């Protein structure tokens, strides 16, 4: 149970692929103009990570070490192709919005890195959990950044959610404030860089506060030689 908890905590927070490892920044900065796009690409990446880790782990005993990387890339490409066809079939609007960034998941360092660092050494179910946790950590970072940019840039939240979830999701659209002059900086790539920098700063402050709190609550160590003295 402690290993499972550690995998989840590492993926979601301590070793977050976007906020700690700073991997996959190209789609993170390019696609997060809205919360819907960010959520769509994040969930697609999570599905690819989970299935890839599961497959790599299941085949690890029969994968020659000398050619393991090309095999991993073939597995990832196959999974990404399947996910791309699913999105094209059931969420065509989202497919058009994400464009080239769906097939580019194949080259994402997060996917190849987890296959090599974790899935090739652990069992299938732990590997699948690792992929899911890493993917959800990246999805969370994308969603927060996409939400901030959409709110500041358009004054809305979940605009176009029906392209991801279907027609019923139109009711999820929220107009937080009305503006005739959108805040363009938030919608452009420089705004994504600034938003990511602010998120990194907030995470650092939270980590430092948690570290200080643990240090204050930890029992003080008894100096050597002091035991038994009156």
Curated annotation (Swiss-Prot):
The chain crosses the membrane at residues 18-38, 39-59, 63-83, 86-106, 125-145, 182-202. The keyword Membrane applies. Keywords: Cell inner membrane, Cell membrane, Electron transport, Membrane, Translocase, Transmembrane, Transmembrane helix, Transport. GO terms for biological process: electron transport chain. It is a multi-pass membrane protein. It is found in: Cell inner membrane. Coiled coil: none annotated. Its EC number is 7.-.-.-. Its main location: membrane. GO terms for cellular component: plasma membrane. Belongs to the NqrDE/RnfAE family. HAMAP family: RsxE_RnfE. Part of a membrane-bound complex that couples electron transfer with translocation of ions across the membrane. Required to maintain the reduced state of SoxR. The complex is composed of six subunits: RsxA, RsxB, RsxC, RsxD, RsxE and RsxG. PANTHER family: ELECTRON TRANSPORT COMPLEX PROTEIN RNFE (PTHR30586), ION-TRANSLOCATING OXIDOREDUCTASE COMPLEX SUBUNIT E (PTHR30586:SF0). This is Ion-translocating oxidoreductase complex subunit E. It comes from Salmonella dublin (strain CT_02021853).
């Amino acid at each position: 149970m402690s290993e499972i908890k550690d995998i989840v905590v590492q993926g979601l927070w301590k070793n977050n692929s976007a906020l700690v490892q700073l991997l996959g920044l190209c789609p993170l900065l390019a696609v997060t103009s809205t919360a819907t796009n960010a959520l769509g690409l994040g969930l697609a990446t999570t599905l690819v990570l989970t299935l890839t880790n599961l497959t790599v782990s299941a085949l690890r005993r029969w994968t020659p070490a000398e050619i393991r990387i090309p095999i991993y890339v073939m597995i990832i490409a196959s999974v990404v192709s399947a996910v791309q066809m699913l999105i094209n079939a059931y969420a065509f609007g989202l497919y058009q919005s994400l464009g080239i960034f769906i097939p580019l998941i194949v080259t994402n360092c997060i996917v190849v890195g987890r296959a090599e660092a974790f899935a090739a050494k652990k069992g299938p179910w732990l590997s699948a959990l690792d992929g899911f946790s890493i993917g959800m950590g990246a999805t969370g970072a994308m969603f927060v950044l996409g939400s901030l940019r959409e709110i500041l840039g358009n004054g809305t939240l979940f605009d176009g959610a029906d392209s991801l979830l279907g027609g019923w999701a139109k009711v999820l659209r929220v107009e937080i404030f009305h503006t005739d002059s959108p805040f363009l900086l938030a919608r452009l790539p420089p705004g994504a860089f600034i938003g990511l920098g602010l998120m990194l700063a907030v995470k650092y402050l939270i980590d430092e506060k948690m570290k200080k709190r643990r240090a204050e609550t930890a029992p003080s160590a008894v100096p050597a030689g002091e035991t038994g003295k009156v």
